[in-house]
Amino acid sequence: TGLNFLKKEKFQGGIIVMDADGQDDPEYLIDIFKESKKNPERTITINRTKRDDELPFKILYQMYLFLSFLLTFKYLKFGVYSYLHSSSLDKILSTNDIHLAYAASLAKHFKNKNVIFAPRKKRILGESQNNYKSLTHYALKIISVFRNQVLINSIVLVFISFLLSKLITSSALFLFILLALLFFNVIIFLLAYQINKSH
């Protein structure tokens, strides 16, 4: 990746990462420059304020945000568009999480971040990847970055569902949640293993 190249070349300074499809508004570069001057080593994310998608996709996207928050305790409203300092390269490149999902890797490795809010612009290059299949794959990769946290949270959810099953004298709920979370954890660990192996 470009970040690996910058690390190899021992680049010193600020780094801005953005997509080249037109959706990351270059007009906000000025805001990034101004914000970065306050604390050059503080990571900055550009959080999107709106999405121009069809209603069913918006609903599904909000469901994904809720599910990912439930499992990871992270609410990710930003994508690739971001700023980080060269001093942060060692941390973000210390694992292969960046190959799963760059935004999730930022959220995992940098707890304290500055935020700039900006709408997503219309795509000018390439076809939109906003479909149900790509969203599902994207969500799995995002959550896979936090797979260890997800496993812990899943165990807690299984325990809570076990207690609930005792209260309502039914084991169906407990069994369903147990199997669903078991299957889900296997999927995200396999996905992470596959991508880590390829890098």
Question: What kind of region is each of these model predictions?
Answer:
Residues 1-6, 14-17, 23-100, 122-133:
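Acceptor/aglycone-binding surface of glycosyltransferases and processive sugar-polymer synthases
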Residues 43-46, 70-75, 110-111, 141-146, ...:
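Short, surface-exposed, polar/charged, turn-prone segments marking secondary-structure boundaries
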Residues 151-199:
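Membrane-embedded multi-pass helical conduit in multi-pass membrane proteins
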